[in-house]
Regions:
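Long, contiguous binding/interaction regions
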Residues: 1-40, 44-45, 59-66, 73, ...
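Glycine/charge-rich, flexible interdomain linkers and switch-proximal surface loops
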Residues: 39-49, 83-100
Length: 132
């Protein structure tokens, strides 16, 4: 026997639907884990694949992983899951792709080498709009 179709609306998968609110939560989670040199770049007008980059650093592999865990946990609380995660096990550069924003958590040397802030220099730095 087939289940009866429901006419009730389903709950949205994402409860934090406002991108800036999600970025603000990610910033707070990173700050809670003592992320250093945190920057938020607004890429909406210079990129067609995401609206914001959150870039920050940790001083060790463990701290980079702890920051990534904290951001993911905070997003899970809002029923938001990353589309893709890269680099967690190595702890040098962890990328958390949430679609409309991407979190980059580096150790110092890879951050200097890849220099995303310089690469995306046309994007406004809006960090102060997201600090708690």
């Amino acid at each position: 026997m087939r289940p009866e179709p429901t006419t009730q609306p389903t709950q949205p998968i994402v409860s934090i639907v406002d991108t800036p609110a999600r970025v603000r939560e990610a910033v707070a989670a990173a700050e809670d884990r003592k992320a250093v040199d945190l920057r938020v770049l607004h890429l909406e007008k210079v990129s067609d694949f995401t609206d914001f980059f959150l870039i920050c650093s940790g001083t060790s592999e463990r701290q980079v992983q702890a920051i990534a865990d904290a951001v993911q946990e905070r997003m899970r609380e809002g029923q938001v899951r990353p589309l893709h995660v890269e680099g967690f096990n190595r702890g040098q550069w962890v990328l958390l792709d949430y679609g409309d924003f991407v979190v980059h958590i580096f150790q110092e040397e890879p951050r200097r080498f890849y220099s995303l802030e310089r690469l995306w220099g046309d994007a406004p730095d809006v960090t102060n709009e997201f600090r708690s």
